[in-house]
Amino acid sequence: MNVLKEVYATIEKRIEEKPEGSYVAKLTTDDKKTAVNKICEKVGEEAAEVIIAAKDNDKAEIIYESADLIFHTMVLLAKSGITYEELSEEFKKRMK
């Protein structure tokens, strides 16, 4: 299993099970609209940090902040009921 798929599965599990102390559970426990708004704020914040790191030409920081951006985007997708497989299918369509 690839690491992104593993992370996505963990996110889905934490949204479902809401374990105490879980960052994902904390982000996603509110009603859907409030949770999505919180997650969108994080996605925007992380996107800005990727942009700053890229403009600074800081490779390590670009990698670090990109991982945060991808993670929070995955939380948003999972909270929206989108599966890893659905996302993968969309990428496959675009490879043609």
UniProtKB/Swiss-Prot annotation:
Coiled coil: none
Keywords, comma-separated and alphabetical: Amino-acid biosynthesis, ATP-binding, Cytoplasm, Histidine biosynthesis, Hydrolase, Nucleotide-binding
CDD domains membership: NTP-PPase_HisIE_like
InterPro entries, sorted: HisE, PRib-ATP_PPHydrolase-like
Top enzyme category: hydrolase
Protein family membership: Belongs to the PRA-PH family.
EC number(s) recorded for this UniProt protein: 3.6.1.31
Key word Hydrolase present: yes
One GO term of the biological process aspect: L-histidine biosynthetic process
GO terms assigned for molecular function: ATP binding; phosphoribosyl-ATP diphosphatase activity
Reaction(s) catalysed (UniProt annotation): 1-(5-phospho-beta-D-ribosyl)-ATP + H2O = 1-(5-phospho-beta-D-ribosyl)-5'-AMP + diphosphate + H(+)
Protein species of origin: Methanococcus maripaludis (strain DSM 14266 / JCM 13030 / NBRC 101832 / S2 / LL)
Location of the protein in the cell: Cytoplasm
Pathway: Amino-acid biosynthesis; L-histidine biosynthesis; L-histidine from 5-phospho-alpha-D-ribose 1-diphosphate: step 2/9
Keyword match Aminoacyl-tRNA synthetase: no
Protein name as annotated: Phosphoribosyl-ATP pyrophosphatase
GO cellular component: cytoplasm
Pfam family, any one: PRA-PH
Main localisation: cytoplasm
